[in-house]
Each structure stands twice: as structure tokens, then as C-alpha cells.
């Protein structure tokens, strides 16, 4: 891990002292070592019970602080702060909720929730992956391994969703409706990417570079508006190894 710049270290300590806070962690690309020189710093603020965003605003740092739940069910709020020349993203995490989702994942169960910024939605085991890959700075958080039951259950479910998406891609292609067709193709590709990652017992934190991590880079070029839509659907389905679901 790269050493924290002093302003980021100071902010982490301030967040850890807020009422309700139980831990502050370094997350994102800085934690996993995949960052660029210009990458932001991501801090996860884990709390139990409740957290008052006004306490974060009262720290006085320039930027935006959301309300709880304002960003969606998985990313349930946070802040974009500027500390001099350093950009910091703070993500609020209800540890009780995260641990409940983690317990479900241990039994191979999960939901896929609509989440801003995600094409296929975010699986409820995603926050467990954040715990597994983060770097704790203050306090303690669980550090789960990828559950074998999840590795057994998730791939089939994701591929089933891909098959349904390809069915609808075919329907949109038949109607020469390019935008929803492309959307369904992207949905199918990302679902198969999730399936592959689960088979490898690897956590997924978001959809950034997920297609490449899953070894599906070649599929990107198949979603091409210059070819006919039916041909694009057939090419993507073949590349994914998934047959579009037949409605009858």
C-alpha cells in the first residue's frame, strides 16, 4: 500500500472519531495496488446503528456530503471531498447490513440490487469483497474469504440472467431498436463476467474493468453498431458460450 498523504491520514482519523463510527478503511484501487498516479483516495467509513452526515459536513472540508441512502442500497451514501490538491471519496457503510449480507453469502444466497452507476446492479455480496480487500486504518472489520457455497451458486444464476438478456437482445434486434439491444448485450457480457469471477473465487467490487478481469476483452469489439444487430447478438452469444433463452 502506498503511504497515505498527511491530509488523507488526518481525515481518516477525524472520520474514525465520529459518533457511530467503528472503522475507517482504505479501499478501491489504492488498497488493491491497481491505482494510477491520478487516482482518487477512497475511504470506507463503517458505522453501526446510525451515522449523521452533518457530522461529516461539520469537519469543514470542501466538497459534497450526501444523506444516508441517497446513493442507493449498496453505496448508501458518502462524500466527495477536496483536501488541497488531493481528492478523497468517502463511502458510508452500515456494518450491520454488510454483515447480514455476508452471512447470506456464506450460504450461497444473494440479491442483485439496482444501484446507481451499475449496469446489471450490485450483488449484495459486493460489500463483503470490499471488507476482504480493504486496508484497515482505524478499528477492525471482518476479512472474509470467498464462500465456497457462493462460488457454487452464483455462476449459474449469473449465466441464467445472461441468457434472458440475450433473449431480449434478439427481440430488440428484430425490431431494429439499437439502444436497448446494446444495453441487453452489455448486461449479458457483465453477467457472464460475474459468473467467471465467482467460479474463480474472486471478489468483484464494481464493474470497472470487470470485463477485462474476466477474460472477455474480445467481446467488447462484437458490440459494434456497424454490423447488423442480429449478427451482433449472435456473435456475442457465441463468444459468451450462452444460448439466448427461448421463450417457447
Annotate each language-model stretch with its function.
Residues 9-13, 29-31, 75:
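A generic local structural motif
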Residues 27-62, 77, 81-93:
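Catalytic metal-binding acidic patch
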Residues 14-15, 31-34, 178:
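Short, flexible, glycine/charge-rich loop motifs used to bind or transfer phosphoryl groups or to couple energy/partner
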Residues 131-248:
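Conserved nucleotidyltransferase catalytic core and NTase-mimicking acidic/glycine-rich helix/loop elements
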Residues 1-25:
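Helical scaffold of the NTase/Pol beta-like nucleotidyltransferase catalytic core
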Residues 61-173:
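Conserved NTP/Mg2+-binding pocket subregion across the NTase superfamily
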Residues 37-38, 101-104, 210:
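Short aromatic-enriched loop/helix-cap "lid" or pocket-rim segments at secondary-structure transitions
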Residues 15, 60-63, 240:
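Hydrophobic, Leu/Ile/Phe/Ala-enriched alpha-helical segments that form helix-helix packing faces
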Amino acid at each position: 500500500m502506498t503511504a497515505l498523504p498527511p491530509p488523507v491520514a488526518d481525515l481518516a482519523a477525524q472520520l474514525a472519531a465520529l459518533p457511530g463510527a467503528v472503522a475507517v478503511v482504505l479501499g478501491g484501487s489504492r488498497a488493491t495496488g491497481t491505482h494510477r498516479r491520478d487516482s482518487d483516495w477512497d475511504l470506507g467509513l463503517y458505522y453501526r446503528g446510525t451515522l449523521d452526515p452533518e457530522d461529516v459536513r461539520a469537519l469543514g472540508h470542501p466538497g459534497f456530503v450526501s444523506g444516508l441512502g441517497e446513493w442507493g442500497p449498496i453505496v448508501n451514501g458518502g462524500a466527495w471531498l477536496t483536501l488541497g490538491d488531493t481528492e478523497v471519496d468517502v463511502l458510508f457503510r452500515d456494518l450491520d447490513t454488510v454483515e447480514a449480507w455476508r452471512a447470506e453469502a456464506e450460504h450461497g444466497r444473494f440479491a442483485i440490487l439496482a444501484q446507481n452507476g451499475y449496469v446489471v446492479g450490485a450483488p449484495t455480496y459486493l460489500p463483503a469483497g470490499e471488507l476482504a480487500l480493504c486496508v484497515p486504518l482505524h478499528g477492525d472489520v471482518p476479512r472474509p474469504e470467498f464462500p465456497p457455497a457462493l462460488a457454487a451458486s452464483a455462476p449459474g444464476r449469473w449465466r441464467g440472467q445472461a441468457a434472458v438478456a440475450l433473449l431480449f437482445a434478439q427481440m430488440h434486434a428484430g425490431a431494429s431498436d439499437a439502444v436497448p439491444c446494446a444495453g441487453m448485450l452489455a448486461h449479458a457480457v457483465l453477467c457472464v463476467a460475474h459468473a467467471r469471477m465467482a467460479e474463480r473465487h474472486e471478489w468483484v467490487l464494481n464493474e470497472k474493468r470487470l470485463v477485462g478481469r474476466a477474460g472477455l476483452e474480445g467481446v467488447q469489439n462484437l458490440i459494434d453498431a456497424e454490423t447488423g444487430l442480429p449478427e451482433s447478438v449472435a456473435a456475442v452469444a457465441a463468444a459468451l458460450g450462452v444460448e439466448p433463452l427461448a421463450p417457447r
